[in-house]
């Protein structure tokens, strides 16, 4: 943890103003320590004014007061990308809800944060790259199957320039933290690559050769949509409507029948009842292509309307980053 410590000088709802001495960056993550307890509330810098930073807190701020300390991490809000995302249910900060329930019970405690991906589960890794090859960001080093989907283990997106593959792990089972490849830069630096990548949610991924324009329709198998309101594969569409109009039902139908590899549902600002309905129905929906449960190729991110605004906003960025 960084030694950059700030002091709270004002609290207003889920916003707090923090005074700091050392440099702080926009969108940096910090942890507000609640009174004299060990509870640490995750927050993010949204504005910097001189030596004061306005921060939005992702949890209920009851008990937070002037004089409490804030630990700045020096890192931006980021999500973990790698095998283990499918079939999982996360909150807006990518905490796995089933694991949170096991640890905290029915009532989640503030300040509880878990790793998004299971560190103990082993995945079958198959190398693709060979030692001596030249690679760059987003090049494939190997593959890992998860259900019907195959993950590509890529050169980290943050790297720039050309790298030489020093070594690649042989085919076998590894967890997401084990090193599966070593890359060497032109200046001699060595980069160790694992199956998991951290990527800031508010930084666009630029490691692509070209941006493809949507040219094909996405077949939703809903006649009125495919006939009168066709959706482009790789495009965007909106379902506006009042309460009870069937927005969530249409979302379920699209998720079940659309010709896609992965389904990611972000229940952002939904009523709690609709989120519960989603969690109950998706494991029971059958994938027409495989005959197995749709949940095997689905990731759900839950942030109900009762959650703080900051957490609901973060869930949108989290969902989009995982999708990319």
What are the residue ranges of the model-derived segments?
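Short hydrophobic/aromatic-rich motifs at helix boundaries and adjacent loops
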Residues: 1-3, 111-113, 198-200, 207-208, ...
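Switch/coupling sub-region of P-loop NTPases
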Residues: 218-324
């Amino acid at each position: 943890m960084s030694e950059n410590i700030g002091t709270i000088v004002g609290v207003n709802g889920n916003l707090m103003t923090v005074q700091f001495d050392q440099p702080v960056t926009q969108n940096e993550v910090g942890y507000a320590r609640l009174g004299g307890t060990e509870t640490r509330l995750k927050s993010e810098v949204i504005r910097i004014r001189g030596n004061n930073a306005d921060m939005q807190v992702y949890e209920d701020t009851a008990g937070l007061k002037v004089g409490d300390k804030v630990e700045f991490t020096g890192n931006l809000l980021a999500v973990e990308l790698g095998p283990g995302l499918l079939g999982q249910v996360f909150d807006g900060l990518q905490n796995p809800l089933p694991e949170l329930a096991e640890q905290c019970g029915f009532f989640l405690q503030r300040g509880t944060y878990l790793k998004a991906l299971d560190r103990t589960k082993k995945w079958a890794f198959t190398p693709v790259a060979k030692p001596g090859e030249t690679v760059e960001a987003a090049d494939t080093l190997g593959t890992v199957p998860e259900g019907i989907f195959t993950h590509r283990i890529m050169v980290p997106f943050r790297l720039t320039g050309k790298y030489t593959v020093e070594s690649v792990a042989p085919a076998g089972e590894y967890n997401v933290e084990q090193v599966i490849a070593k890359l060497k830069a032109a200046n001699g630096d060595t980069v160790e690559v694992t199956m998991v990548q951290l990527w800031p949610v508010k930084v666009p991924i630029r490691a692509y050769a070209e941006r493809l324009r949507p040219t094909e329709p996405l077949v939703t198998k809903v006649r009125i949509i495919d006939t009168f309101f066709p959706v482009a594969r790789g495009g965007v569409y909106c379902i506006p409507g009042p309460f009870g109009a069937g927005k969530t039902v249409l979302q379920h139908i699209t998720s079940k029948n659309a010709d896609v590899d992965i389904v990611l549902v972000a229940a952002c600002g939904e009523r709690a009842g609709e989120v519960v309905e989603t969690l109950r129905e998706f494991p029971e929906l059958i994938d027409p292509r495989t005959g197995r449960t749709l949940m095997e190729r689905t990731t759900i991110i839950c942030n109900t309307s009762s959650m703080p605004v900051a957490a609901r906003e973060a869930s949108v960025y989290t969902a989009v980053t995982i999708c990319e």
